[in-house]
């Protein structure tokens, strides 16, 4: 099924409910981000919309930020195996070849997912566009050496990158 596309003008003029529904997939399972942005319309460009949505997350407090981080699936994780990813996550993970892992790569990703979640208490997040499986695994391994505070920051920054990619796919410039 082809994803809907909108113009910024359509989103600016939409009801708050329609705006939130259109942007509900931008920040994984977190419509509250779109709800906050709806109050700031109109937007002159996608950059401003993205900044406003990201700022809503930045100012939300750690509990909401952690909930947003935890709303993201593990890379090549259980949700992917069970076919429970959102359409956006499925496209992104497939685009990086995570649906074509060898058994060895899959086992390595599963071990990294467990180690990362055990150390930090949330899933590893990476905007996978532009990465192949080997690059994802290398990034995963390197980030396991970070502090929890550094990984919270890295996770949010990656979420903002994912959101920008999703906005660019959804909105016709």
Region spans (language model):
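Surface-exposed, charge/polar-rich loops and edge strands
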Residues: 19
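C-terminal non-catalytic interaction appendages of large macromolecular assemblies
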Residues: 101-173
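Aromatic-anchored, charged helix-turn/loop surface patch used as a conserved interaction hotspot
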Residues: 5-13, 25-27, 33-112, 161-173
């Amino acid at each position: 099924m082809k994803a809907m596309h909108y113009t910024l003008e359509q989103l600016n003029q939409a009801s708050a409910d329609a705006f939130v529904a259109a942007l509900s997939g931008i920040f994984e399972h977190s419509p509250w981000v779109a709800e906050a942005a709806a109050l700031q319309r109109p937007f002159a460009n996608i950059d401003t919309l993205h900044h406003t949505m990201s700022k809503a997350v930045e100012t939300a407090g750690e509990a909401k930020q952690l909930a947003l981080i935890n709303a993201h699936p593990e890379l090549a994780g259980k949700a992917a195996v069970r076919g429970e990813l959102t359409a956006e996550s499925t496209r992104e993970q497939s685009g990086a070849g995570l649906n074509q892992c060898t058994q060895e790569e899959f086992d390595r990703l599963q071990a990294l997912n467990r180690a990362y979640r055990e150390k930090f208490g949330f899933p590893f997040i990476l905007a996978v566009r532009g990465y192949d499986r080997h690059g994802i695994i290398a990034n995963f391994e390197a980030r396991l050496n970070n502090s929890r505070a550094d990984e919270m920051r890295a996770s949010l920054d990656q979420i903002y990158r994912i959101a920008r990619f999703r906005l660019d796919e959804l909105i016709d410039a």
